Amino acid sequence: MSTFIKNWKRITLFQVKAIEENIDRLTSSFSSNGELVVFATAFGDVSIYNSSFKSLQSIKVEDESSIQQILWLDNKTFLLFSNVEGGTGTNSTVIIYAFSQADENEPPQFVLVTTHKFSINESPYPIIAVSQSPIDKTIACGFGGGLVSCYHGNPLRERGIKNSYSHNLGEPITGLTYLDDQSSVLFIATTNKTYSLSGKSLSCLDNTGVSLNCSSSCKTTPLQSREKNSSSFVCTRSSGLTFYDSKREKICFTFPGEKHYMTVMGSILALCYTPTLGTDSSTNEGLKKSFSSSSSIRKADASRNPAFPPRLLLVDLSRNLIVWEGHLKDVAVSILPLKHGFLVVTADDNVFELKRITLQEEISLLCQKMMYNLAISLAKKENMDIEFRESLMRDYASFLFRRGDFSASMDWYIRSIKSIDIPSVCLEFLKAQEIKQLIRLLEELIKTGLATSDHRLLLLSCYVEIHDSPSIRKLIDIGEIDFDQAFKICYDSNLLDEAKHLAIRFNNNERVLDVLVESEQYSEALRFFESLPPSNLLPLLLKYGRVLLDKLPEKTTNIFIQFYSNSHRGDLSTSESKGELKTAKSLRQTYLSLLPYAQVANFSLPPSLYEISPSQEENQRAALFSEDVSYTAPSPQTCFHIFLNHNSELISFLEGILPNASPNYKTLINTCLFEAYIRESFASSNVEKQEFWQEKSNSLLKKVEKNVDLNAVFLISQILGFDDGVRFVQGKSGQTLDIFRSFCQQNDIERALKMVRVHGPDQQELYIMMLNCFASLENVDSWYQDINEIVNIIVSQRLISPTQLLDILGKSVNIKLEHISDSMQSVLDNYRESISKQNEAIEMGKRDIEEITSQLSILRTRAFVVQESKCSTCGIDLELPMVHFRCGHSYHQRCVEDECIRCRWL
């Protein structure tokens, strides 16, 4: 804000209205309360006019005293002040006439209520200024001789006021006033200095004096740092205006020129002045010095240049505007503030009114002058219709936009956001390529709840254009956006991390995995699988499992195992990976073309590379999880096709889920696992590995023979040429003996022995048949160990008698007794040991019988002494009837039944 008032903007807000009425040339004082004007003459004549300068009442005061000052206490009460010469000539008498409105009549009529007279020990100098304190209603009078006299009390009561204290400054007083901010400080201006009087404490504020009628109180100070509605004491001097606040701090504004009269109405300051002779700084400095005293003022008056006629200036202090300026014929002018303007009384007693234009006209004029901010403030101050104010805001925003001040323009568009044409505004800023300002508007639409899905998409497009990744994520987190189009915008712009974040926010797991697989973030894809709840996992596993098996077979297999074994629970702790984003496509070509506002815009910002910082997944996903989630895995058969050409992973998968699989699925799993073993065996070129997998196949059949589909095993074994599987099924289907006979007929002793070892425990006759097979062989030299094994099994399990065993062995001419002597000796030893154990058991039984018989005999024939005196059950003294047992225990008959409770024996 400029402190040089002449640099303020100018606008004419007042109109001159001539008044035909003239006032009495003998008028000595006048005052106004805004609605009424009071004129008083030197002979005690008082005239009251309304704001249209129509005479309402004439009053003649007693003694025809010269009225020197008029003070309005309120709109219905005013005081007249006069200072007349006393009886001795060395003192004077102050007369205060109190007038009040008689009733509510129209037009108002005032009557004299009371008169107060005070004697002053001083020459009768005229009363220059009067003012009333807003706190204690103290009335201060300033005299031309330098005396300040204060009166306290109620002036409408007889003897209601008294002279409380006085100060003699010794300098002619030119003005005094109390401020309207509940302050008790009295500001006093003299010809040489400026003072403040608080109680009886006098302080000098400035060593520069003020001319007569050039000081006043002011409710507005033209400085933004000031407190609102803070009152000031304003003085106008040749150098400019000085404002003093209640804290005695001052603010100066430059306005060179000789000042003659000043008054204030609200925020409008009216000033009569004569322009300076020069405009350079040296001339202004000389004027400051020449106007520092009353003598210099007189010199300046004498040398006044008629080429510079006096002017009347109206300044709006609150808005820093010059609102009217015009020429006057003479400096001898008086200005009265009215409610809607000023009343100007010229030297020839002519009167004209400066009337303020209407509110609507003022706002219209401000808009024409491009002062939209002032027009808006005025409309708000006057509580005008909100729609009208918003129309002003829109016009101001449009003006700022045309001027190129896009930031300020957007500020005002945002303030009137509820009434603007949003598509048009968006289109304007798109054309101007002001993406950041457009972002501000769209963000405000979201805050105020006015945003549609299209607005959110446009905002997302703008964020993408300026590569504002954090803002993209915040917008995604807000939601309420068309997912498909938003995903397309991010995906087509290669913002894969943001596209993934969007898909996560909308719980679209398939899109998340699309992004991860597309960007070859296979490990991240697996971590995302781990984070999902089981209910969402199956279709995604079936869709992406094959790709992930090709890239990360082991980890992918583990996820399948967890899911199909009912151990998957999901994990919220997965984090988004870092990634460098590719160059963004043109805004026009990719995403803004999707929106209704971009059909005219044709622009694109230069592409660049940037990185997305990692962040945690959204809290909203927590709703999908629960600590006690329970689910039932589907049949493993649903994913078998995923493991095509991944036989090793299929084996790991089946082995992993088998322990926890449902009984309903174990047959399927075992059968499939058997096939996988066989295929792995035939796929290997290493003989050891082939034997290893074939052994696992046979071992599996033995372990889970009850949970395997024999028909499928038989079919698989036949197709893949696995004879062991075929024979296993034949054995389980009752064809074991036939298979064994075929081995014997072919002299395939190894396979026959293998079959005996496999099926012998279930079909023990195979051992006997195997022994017969050995007996029929011509050469048994390499089979003696196996023969002994078979013989031992037959003997240990007593499958046949020793005689039958010898008969079978006797059929062979090649099997000698010495070769199986150990086995036969073992048979004999077993028989001897068995007979010995049986004899020992018989002898022990006999001894036990003899001992028991002896004890029974003693119990039947021998007497015994009863020494118990208390019942062995209840512990109470025994009494008849009682029962005694030979074991030494005694009972009441009621406490026992048929046998001793403690011993339980006869």
Swiss-Prot record:
Compartment annotation: Vacuole membrane; Cytoplasm
Pfam entry (one): zf-C3H2C3
SUPFAM superfamilies, per database record: WD40 repeat-like
GO process terms (BP): endosome organization; Golgi to endosome transport; intracellular protein transport; late endosome to vacuole transport; organelle fusion; vacuole fusion, non-autophagic; vacuole organization; vesicle docking involved in exocytosis
EC number: 2.3.2.27
Topological relation to the membrane, as annotated: Peripheral membrane protein
Keyword Cytoplasm: yes
PROSITE patterns: CHCR
InterPro entries recorded: Clathrin_H-chain/VPS_repeat, VPS11, WD40/YVTN_repeat-like_dom_sf, WD40_repeat_dom_sf, Znf_RING
Broadest EC class assigned to this enzyme: transferase
Alphabetically ordered keywords of this record: Cytoplasm, Membrane, Metal-binding, Protein transport, Transferase, Transport, Ubl conjugation pathway, Vacuole, Zinc, Zinc-finger
Record-level Gene Ontology MF annotations: protein-macromolecule adaptor activity; ubiquitin protein ligase activity; zinc ion binding
Catalytic activities: S-ubiquitinyl-[E2 ubiquitin-conjugating enzyme]-L-cysteine + [acceptor protein]-L-lysine = [E2 ubiquitin-conjugating enzyme]-L-cysteine + N(6)-ubiquitinyl-[acceptor protein]-L-lysine
Mapped zinc finger ranges (RING-type): 871-906
Superkingdom to which the source organism belongs: Eukaryota
UniProt signal peptide: none
GO CC terms of this entry: CORVET complex; cytosol; endosome; fungal-type vacuole membrane; HOPS complex
Repeat region (CHCR), residues: 413-557
Function as written in the Swiss-Prot or TrEMBL entry: Required for vacuolar biogenesis and for trafficking of hydrolase precursors to the vacuole. Mediates transport at the vacuolar membrane where it may be responsible for tethering transport vesicles on the target membranes. Acts as a component of the HOPS complex that acts during the docking stage of vacuole fusion. HOPS is an effector for the vacuolar Rab GTPase ypt7 and is required for vacuolar SNARE complex assembly. It remains bound to SNARE complexes after vacuole fusion. Acts as a component of the CORVET complex that is required for transport between endosome and vacuole.
Quaternary structure note: Component of the homotypic vacuole fusion and vacuole protein sorting (HOPS) complex. Component of the class C core vacuole/endosome tethering (CORVET) complex.
Database matches in PANTHER family: VACUOLAR PROTEIN SORTING-ASSOCIATED PROTEIN, VACUOLAR PROTEIN SORTING-ASSOCIATED PROTEIN 11 HOMOLOG
Protein name: E3 ubiquitin-protein ligase pep5
Organism placement in taxonomy: Eukaryota, Fungi, Dikarya, Ascomycota, Taphrinomycotina
